[in-house]
Amino acid sequence: MLTVVDGEIVEEYDEFINIGQALSPKIISLTGITNEMLAEEGRSEETVAIDLKKKLTEDTIMIAHNAQFDLSFIYFLLKRHYPDEAEDIVGNIQWLDTLTVLKDRMDYPHKLVDAVEHYGVEKVNFHRAIDDTKALYSVTQELKLERDDLEEYINIFGYNPKYGVGKFRFPFITYKPQYYHNRGKLPPNEILPKK
């Protein structure tokens, strides 16, 4: 997680959560994170939940690629430690889903790696959270330069009607079917209907 003030990165939050289980060889290969790293640097889930509760304040705009995943992950982590507060914590901040924005602006595929390539952003190591976060911040800056309408996407998550939203919907997010026609040609208020 990056804290950005006036366009400048002022803090990086990058923590491993040690859940007390060994990582699979696939995860180790994909991320480069080892069991030894978790043993030495990993923090408890409770400690990370405490940190997130402090960091996710009402003036937070959480930018994520496929934000439904990140929102669900953070919500359920917080719910295990703050069962009565979790929904308020994640519901009091604003969410910007860059996957929704990219589906309006560029042709398929829409993975973060594709956005990085499309916008010419430098990326060090995919599948490491802090590197993905820095790349996503750079992509978001490019999206803003391309068309200054990102505010219209706040708390709107697009989804493919063929597959639906999934099992869990958050009441503070507006879910809109997002079709693939007219990418890049119409502003979001015409592609994604207003809340």
Spans of features found by a protein language model:
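Hydrophobic/aromatic-lined pockets within catalytic cores
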Residues: L78-K79, M106, Q141-L145
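Buried hydrophobic packing segments
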Residues: I74, V101, L136-T140
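Acidic, divalent-metal-coordinating active-site segment for phosphoryl/phosphodiester hydrolysis
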Residues: R128-E142
